[in-house]
């Protein structure tokens, strides 16, 4: 029986950035850290200038002739690029409607599970459809279902705003929550006064 082929399970090496000594081109068009054109100079001279500035020589356009490098703080540049990428990803997030289903008679543990699910959806930037399902004659308990949904809205008020108040939809009662954009301002009556220190009796 022929031996089974062996697969290389090692993680692929990350592509290293073309900076400093990793740049292999002998001649480079160099832009200084302030945007000044230093012209076409040798790789060694470019590295020397970057070293004098206590900065990095970074290859920014490999396809140009000769390749273009810029003298910069690569660590700061990388941080700003990653920050921009995260912001772009956040803006490109398509808002979805996630649904949390429950019965009007729900125990505390299951209720907390639904709260956790809704919290996770809201943090991801999605809207939440809270649905109370009625079966058979349970439809007569719409008041209890409405109370449950209002309780959920109250428990999530720091993270969510009510987009649509509880209402009947067929044999269900629904409520829509959307991620809160502005911080919740507590009423003065909800702000607890600091506890007074207890007096000791000698």
UniProtKB/Swiss-Prot annotation:
Domain of life where this protein originates: Bacteria
Any one GO molecular-function label of the UniProt entry: translation initiation factor activity
Database matches in InterPro entries: T_IF-3_C_sf (IPR036788), T_IF-3_N_sf (IPR036787), Translation_initiation_fac3_CS (IPR019813), Translation_initiation_fac_3 (IPR001288), Translation_initiation_fac_3_C (IPR019815), Translation_initiation_fac_3_N (IPR019814)
Subcellular location(s) per record: Cytoplasm
A single Gene Ontology CC term: cytosol
Alphabetically ordered keywords of this record: Cytoplasm, Initiation factor, Protein biosynthesis
GO biological process: ribosome disassembly
Short name of one Pfam family: IF3_N
Function per UniProt: IF-3 binds to the 30S ribosomal subunit and shifts the equilibrium between 70S ribosomes and their 50S and 30S subunits in favor of the free subunits, thus enhancing the availability of 30S subunits on which protein synthesis initiation begins.
PANTHER family: TRANSLATION INITIATION FACTOR IF-3, TRANSLATION INITIATION FACTOR IF-3, MITOCHONDRIAL
Family from the record: Belongs to the IF-3 family.
HAMAP family recorded: IF_3
Subunit structure comment from the entry: Monomer.
The protein, known as: Translation initiation factor IF-3
Organism: Prochlorococcus marinus (strain NATL2A)
Source taxonomy: Bacteria, Bacillati, Cyanobacteriota, Cyanophyceae, Synechococcales
